[in-house]
Amino acid sequence: MLTNKEIKQLIWEKADNVASKLGLEIFDILIKGSNKNKILEVVIDKADGYVSIGDCERFSKAFDPWLDEIDLFDKSYELVVSSPGLDRKLRGKADYERFKGKLAKFILKGKETKHPVVIGYIDEILEDQIKITEKDSGKLFNIDLNEIDKANLEIEL
């Protein structure tokens, strides 16, 4: 019997293969629920834009037969294919570069930080810093990349 970590790795490898054939990427894989009601959520992404419902459907149709064939779970499972969403998590330098000019929320590490949360536009990505223009004040922030605890896009209304 495989561990959840081993199952996730096996699923990731196959999902990545299927996704790349469809011009997609794997953003995350989550295994949720109890042994009786497993939910496998595959979060897909698209390097050149946003994921559509059609993208999710195409991935699901291409990936589901392999899951049924390999029979990784003891009981039945539900496959959920989704996108990272409009307020997607930003996972580092490559994402900051990709979403340059977009509004994002940065939660910083450390209790000593004057501004533990900064919401602003991603201006420039340097070797070990990111430059942000705060949304409300227009103030420029230089944030060390290693000081970022969490970051995600913000929905601009």
UniProtKB/Swiss-Prot annotation:
Keyword match Cytoplasm:
yes
Could you state one GO cellular component term attached to this entry?
cytosol
Tell me any Pfam family this protein matches. Answer: RimP_N
Query: In the UniProt record, does the keyword Iron occur?
Result: no
- What are the BP-aspect GO terms? ribosomal small subunit assembly; translation
Q: What is its main location?
A: cytoplasm
**Keyword annotations from UniProtKB, A to Z:** Cytoplasm, Ribosome biogenesis
Q: Where in the cell is it found?
A: Cytoplasm
What family classification does the UniProt entry report for this protein?
Answer: Belongs to the RimP family.
Q: What does this protein do?
A: Required for maturation of 30S ribosomal subunits.
Question: Know the name of this protein?
Answer: Ribosome maturation factor RimP
| Species the sequence originates in | Petrotoga mobilis (strain DSM 10674 / SJ95)
